[in-house]
Design a protein with these regions (language model features):
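Conserved ABC transporter NBD signature motif
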Residues: 58-66
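Helix-to-loop junction immediately C-terminal to a conserved catalytic motif
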Residues: 50
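Conserved beta-strand-loop-alpha-helix hinge in the C-terminal portion
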Residues: 216-241
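Conserved ABC ATPase signature
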Residues: 136-140, 144
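Catalytic Walker B motif of ABC-type/P-loop ATPase nucleotide-binding domains
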Residues: 161-164
Length: 251
């Protein structure tokens, strides 16, 4: 069974259709990256996949359960299957790292405070931040904040993590450290990652498979191993995209 199955999905706002009739799946344990130029609907697609936005049409199945038709308790159960890290990380500045990680445990679990703290420390340890549990977000680096946000996204032991531009704003060395964290979590815990990114080094080093979205056609123009697509795709739009990434000129 696929971790995520997307069927005839159309994404947009009101009469503004960004993407239409998308069909693809994400395998369990896979690092799956969504590519495309600015304005093509990458982040909007991601938010449709985890249910923040409702699609214009079509369905998204997570672990075989249709999130687009789920409501109430059924929807809450599905939501415990995944975690989300937004582009800015969005840690709460008035809480230390331990408190940030336990935040959603308070709402979605029946654990007592001691149990929540123990579980949160395990998550911080997985991303190399256990010694910093009492630090405030403002007291740690941007890369550490991103790793803390991933720890918080793992608070409910999800099988899937959705990450929106996790390397945004990071220097190459810090970005590579974050990539290693993602790879470790995928390989050691079997977590499925769905990532929006345009960082070429990250894409090549961690992605098992990518899809490339196109603004003009409102669809998927390529799918597969990113290096194979770069070297062998017959579609000139694919080569143009990779060339623009290399020159940091993604439109």
């Amino acid at each position: 069974m696929a971790a995520i199955d997307v069927r005839n999905l159309s994404v947009g706002y009101g009469q503004n259709v960004l993407l239409q009739n998308l069909n693809f799946s994400v395998n369990e344990g896979e690092i799956f990256v969504i590519l495309g130029g600015s304005g093509c609907g990458k982040s909007s697609l991601l938010k449709n996949l985890f249910g923040l936005y409702e699609p214009l049409a079509g369905n998204v199945l997570i672990e075989g359960q249709d999130i687009t038709d789920a409501h109430g308790e059924d929807r809450q159960k599905i939501m415990t299957h995944f975690g989300v890290m937004y582009q800015q990380g969005a840690l709460f500045g008035s809480m230390n790292l331990l408190e940030n990680v336990t935040l959603f445990m308070e709402e979605y679990t029946t654990l007592d405070r001691e149990q929540m703290n123990l579980l949160a420390r395990c998550k911080l340890d997985l991303v190399g931040l256990l010694p910093y549990e009492q630090y405030m977000p403002s007291e740690i680096s941007g890369g550490m904040q991103k790793r803390a946000a991933i720890a918080r996204a793992m608070a409910l032991d999800p099988k899937i993590l959705f990450l929106d531009e996790p390397s945004a704003g990071l220097d190459p060395i810090t970005s590579a450290d974050l990539d290693r964290t993602i790879l470790d979590l995928s390989q050691n815990l079997g977590i499925t990652f769905v990532i929006v990114s345009h960082e070429l080094a990250s894409i090549y080093s961690i992605a098992n498979r990518v899809i490339m979205l196109d603004k003009a056609s409102k669809g998927i123009i390529a799918e597969g191993d990113p290096k194979v697509l770069r070297d062998q795709s017959p579609d000139p739009r694919v080569h143009q995209f990779f060339n623009r990434i290399m020159s940091k000129e993604v439109p």
